[in-house]
């Protein structure tokens, strides 16, 4: 929300949704398998796999579990028909929404995604309708830390930008392919991040009011509940004042 990192917002919103943890792990494993199948099992030469590993570790997945997933992908398995599909649409209040899916059945997936949009006052758009509003970036997040120290180390490691929020949280932005290398450099400097993920960063924000904010959150929850949906990105901005009413 305003003055807070996207990761902090998501973390606090999901804190009461521990029942979804198993589903989150399932989605991460699916991404690990697919990334390894498409680009090989070496994260050093497979940025998509490295990003998936970083996400797995940020969600406290064990090395044994993620290594088994990578081995499945390299060896080929029942997930061989999985493909990445991106859906674009508009949510409440004109919010731009991108939905990243991994699916073996396009018809099933698009039906579920379309249903979520229609139930929450939005509509599914055509390819390219909102994608131009987003840029794919690596985001390395710190709940707190010394801004100058993190900024100096991050920029020296090749980061593109460092943003500090009102609550003291810090986000380091990188080219998505370079996120793993920048995170390694930060850790080598003694700066351990709380989260690292590849995200779609919006170039503009859509302010949500007391009426549209709960509808947007419901849309996000409905989309995330779809088994085929891996990630949901949007440009909705919820102020602290509006958040306090939710």
Curated annotation (Swiss-Prot):
Gene Ontology biological process terms, A to Z: regulation of DNA-templated transcription
One GO cellular component term: cytosol
UniProt keywords, alphabetically: Cytoplasm, DNA-binding, Transcription, Transcription regulation
Claim: Signal is one of the keywords in the record: no
A Pfam family this chain is assigned to: Transcrip_reg
Entry keyword annotation includes Amino-acid biosynthesis: no
Cellular compartments annotated: Cytoplasm
Extent of the signal sequence: none
Gene Ontology molecular function, alphabetical: DNA binding
Similarity comment: family membership: Belongs to the TACO1 family.
The protein's name: Probable transcriptional regulatory protein ESA_01378
Lineage: Bacteria, Pseudomonadati, Pseudomonadota, Gammaproteobacteria, Enterobacterales
């Amino acid at each position: 929300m305003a003055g807070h990192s996207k990761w902090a917002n998501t973390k606090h919103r999901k804190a009461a949704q521990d029942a979804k943890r198993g589903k989150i792990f399932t989605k991460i494993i699916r991404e690990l398998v697919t990334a390894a199948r498409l680009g090989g099992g070496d994260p050093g030469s497979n940025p998509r796999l490295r990003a998936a590993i970083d996400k797995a570790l940020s969600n406290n997945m064990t090395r044994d579990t993620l290594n088994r997933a990578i081995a499945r992908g390299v060896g080929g398995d029942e997930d061989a028909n999985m493909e990445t599909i991106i859906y674009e649409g508009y949510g409440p209040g004109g919010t731009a929404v991108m939905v990243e899916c991994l699916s073996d059945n396009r018809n099933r997936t698009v039906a579920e995604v379309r249903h979520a949009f229609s139930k929450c006052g939005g509509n599914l758009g055509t390819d390219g309708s909102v994608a131009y509003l987003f840029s794919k970036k690596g985001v390395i997040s710190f709940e707190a830390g010394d801004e100058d120290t993190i900024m100096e180390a991050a920029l020296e490691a090749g980061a593109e930008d460092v943003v500090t929020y009102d609550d003291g949280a810090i986000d380091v932005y990188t080219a998505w392919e370079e996120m793993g290398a920048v995170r390694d450099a930060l850790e080598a400097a003694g700066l351990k991040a709380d989260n690292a993920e590849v995200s779609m960063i919006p170039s503009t924000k859509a302010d949500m009011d007391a009426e549209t904010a709960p509808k947007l959150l419901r849309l996000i929850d409905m989309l995330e509940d779809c088994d085929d949906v891996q990630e949901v990105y949007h440009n909705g901005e919820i102020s602290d004042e509006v958040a306090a009413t939710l």
